[in-house]
Amino acid sequence: MPVSPPRAAAFEILLRIDATDAYASELLHSLRFSKLSSADRGLLTELVMGALRWRGVIDQAIAKHSAQPLGKFDREVLTALRLGAYQLLFLDRIPAHAAVNESVELVKQARKGSAAGMVNAILRKIAKGPRDRSDISHPDWLVDRWTQNYGSEIARKICDYNNTAPRQAVRISTIQSNVGTAAPGCPRAEGPIGKRIEANSEPNRAAVDGQPRAAVPTWSLDDLRADGICLVPGNLLRNALTVKSGDITHSEAFRERRLIIQDEASQLVALLVGKGKAFLDCCAAPGGKTRIIAEQNPDSTIMAMELHPHRAALLKKLVMSDNVRVIAADARQFPLDKKFDRVLVDAPCSGTGTLARNPEIKWRLKAEDILRLQGYQLEILAAAMNHVAPGGRLIYSTCSLEPEENERVIEKALAVNAEFRLVDCRDELRMLKERHELMIDNIESLLSGAHLRTIPGVHPTDGFFAAILEKK
């Protein structure tokens, strides 16, 4: 019996995620699966992300009907069970027999045929039983931590947000964008989107040094509508849009980097970097923040560092700007003796603010990882502080919700380096508001003391933290 392409692909991706440190978002967009039809790609994404988001509920259902502990299953068998159980518990449109039979076939094709009968029996019991989706599907230690740090109500909001597929945010590239009107049926041929895009289109921005800007290719929201893509205004930023429907990666605007996929909180962190002449981006891949810095500072020089050469190559491909130099280097051991006006440390972190997009993280992460990461973050931050010019600024950010990776890092860094002071992010957000970059009215909702903080479920974004340090 053949297995449908999306189920076979989902099985392969889930196996790789379980066996390695691979990320679902990267595997789903790999060339290996690029030839799937649009419908099959949609089902593939649903199967992979759903099975990861709801693994807690799925594993409870499997354990309820199995005499064998889950830890005793072969990886291939447990993956097939999880894939089948997700369809039975959450996808009403999938016939139960298809979910069961193809999961059994996956086990056979993985040369685990001796377990086929058991897989069949467990999934049929799940299919006949009640659908209990009440579990929050997060590790207890993580929920307990959020409850302690944010309270039970916000902890629940975080979990609920993480268990829902988030809408994709995109940013209008001010380097290349010259946008026409929206299509009928997709909001804003006239209105916020049209005004917002036209204001950011290169020909409509002020001339540089009295010289008109060069013409760039025009793209229209009509073009996106023709591809089945509908955009609505973002939630925080003038330059951000939200994908209401369709696949933006299939559009010419995306392929030509006129629209960049980037969460709004990530965009906001890059805007906090501000203006300058010489920039250092210490942990720059995948490059979204670097690109914003380059767009905001076209006459500056920017050095973008990335530890891993293959990620540095991807960074260079995304940024594609003459004023950006990409180097593969360890941010803890900066290879040049140079000072910068602005330094961005978007530190490697636990990623607990991005679990809606990266649900595999919550099943990999261990409590002890957070303190281990803190040590790494402190090393990077200490090295970066040595390269800030007098009067210059360092912006430290993570996509973590954990205080140990955020406030505690800043406190420890300032305790051993009296040359720096903490700058209140409130002032920077007000300036962004005055420049009509920031569209939200309640700036205070984005703050935790002097720091920027967004929380999934409280804000319609990933969870981010940022602090601004200024050298005296």
For the regions a language model picked out, list residue spans one by one.
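S-adenosylmethionine
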Residues: 1-180, 185, 191-192, 196-205, ...
